[in-house]
Amino acid sequence: MRCRQRRAQLLSYFAGRTKRISLGTAVIVLPWHDPVRVAEEIALLDVLCGGRCVFGFGRGAASVEYEGFRIPMEEARPRFVEAAQIVVKALSNDSFEHEGRFFQIPRTAIRPRPISRPERRFYASAVSPDSAEIMAKLGFGILMVMQNEWPKAAEDIARYRAIATEAGHSPRPPIILTNVCCAESREEAHERAFKYLGLKWQSIDTHYHFSDGHLATVKGYESYGKMAKTYAKINASAEAKTKATDFYVSIQIVGTPSDCLDKIAELQRCTGMDHLVAEFSFGGLPHEEAEVNMRLFADKVLPVLQRDPAFAVPEMPERTVAGTERDNIFAPA
């Protein structure tokens, strides 16, 4: 059994240690938590970091974690939707009440009040088409983990945008999460990526048990049946695992600094993303190698992303508010 730490608690440390960098959660799994407590943690973190945090949510897909929290996995989808609605309601109103299937909340108010509008920076993980539809209808931005060919990801994003628009929301550009392996030579980058992304791929299956197909029978997770078939084929032979790892490496940001820039530009063109979450440490990659990976990217790739107009993107909405509004954040309800 393995349970995850509270994201806002960890980020409060970084909020106190930094002044300018953006912070973010990926992800808060809402079905595991009391939504009023989540809203309070978000509000306090918003105060501590000065409106610098982007909040990512998800519904989770690991049965071992649901068992640890003693929550039926079949309730994940309706619990997520109801909890998400409560969190938004709590942060966007001076006081609120709620009567639902899972939560009955008498009129209450969140203190401290957030100093910005964090609910306008809500994103949610969309690994499956079902999740993308839920997030679109809620009006959340989409946080997409790159596990498909980029044109397929673009199709999923277009579908999300269409559903969000139909639901009366203005869809935001997606945030893309990808692994990055940057090295001085393509050979070195690919060798490192193949080894450690392959191990990451295996660890994902070990944790989520995708290959055994159990999720296909869980209400709300039926679409994961296709994933089970894919993993079963991968695990059938060493050759299949090699091909699968090659494919996984091909859809990440892997190569020399120049290659990384070209791939990020293509990913931005294909998906319309305005923010990239780069994972530099994966699959047991030794800390020293992860640091070299990150520093090379920071030295050779990041400066170009920062100064080249082709990569320019707008700021996240509603980051800060006037100082006078800060004075009342701890006022009693």
Model-derived regions, located:
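Acidic (Asp/Glu)-rich catalytic clusters
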Residues: 11-22, 42-52, 133-137, 161-169, ...
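Glycine-rich, proline-tolerant flexible connector loops at the mouths of alpha/beta enzymes
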Residues: 1-17, 29, 147-150, 279-290
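Hydrophobic faces of well-ordered beta-strands that scaffold small-molecule active sites
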Residues: 23-26, 53-57, 122-125, 142-145, ...
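Flexible, glycine-rich active-site loops centered on histidine and acidic residues
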Residues: 31-102, 142, 148-154, 192-194, ...
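A conserved active-site cap/scaffold subdomain adjacent to cofactor or substrate pockets
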Residues: 128, 136-144, 148, 157
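An alpha-helical appendage that flanks or caps ligand/catalytic pockets
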Residues: 76-110, 151-273, 302, 306-333
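N-terminal beta1-alpha1-beta2 module of alpha/beta enzyme domains
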Residues: 1-23, 118-120, 315-324, 328-333
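Conserved, mostly hydrophobic/aromatic
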Residues: 14, 45, 87, 122, ...
